[in-house]
Amino acid sequence: MKNYVKTKASLSERDEAICVDIFRNIMRARHLLRSKASNVAESNGLHAAEMNVIDILGKFGPISMGRLAAETFISPSNTTNTVKKLERAGLVERQRSANSDREVHVTLTGQGRIVFRKCYPRILGEVHAHMAERLTRGELRQLEILLGKLVGGGMA
């Protein structure tokens, strides 16, 4: 008998094992990829969450605090704290929206864009190198499609 609680879902042992393996492998992949980004961030005097904000702003341009929180998967309060740190460092600036006094947009400063242009290619390069050592181009494309389906984005 297994030492875990059975769920209401009636999965076969094989389906349950597959589900657990997929979950654990996704979590391992997340940890591995985040550590690569963290190493680049730390080598530039930043925390991973700060680098994540810089990456999102570098890719999307000025965006609202709410969208920034959603894109970075950071809680709104932690997003605010991270943006404040980056603002004090001169890497981002906040501005009230022209459409709403309540909405605040965040953008990279010139110095923030320099950090983005320096770090983003390194992160992408390390991630790509890791994946390319293990997967063919076709497998990478298949992984992209399957993960997109898994998170509800359909085909990328």
Roles of regions detected by a PLM:
Residues 1-14, 137-156:
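C-terminal regulatory/oligomerization modules of transcriptional regulators
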Residues 1-44, 108:
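N-terminal leader segment of winged-helix/HTH proteins
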Residues 65-66, 77, 84, 104:
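Residues within helix-turn-helix
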Residues 4, 8, 34, 84-142:
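Charged, amphipathic alpha-helical coiled-coil/dimerization segments
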Residues 24, 52-56, 80-82:
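Base-recognition residues in the alpha-helical recognition helix of bacterial helix-turn-helix
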Residues 31-75:
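N-terminal helix-turn-helix DNA-binding core of bacterial DNA-binding proteins
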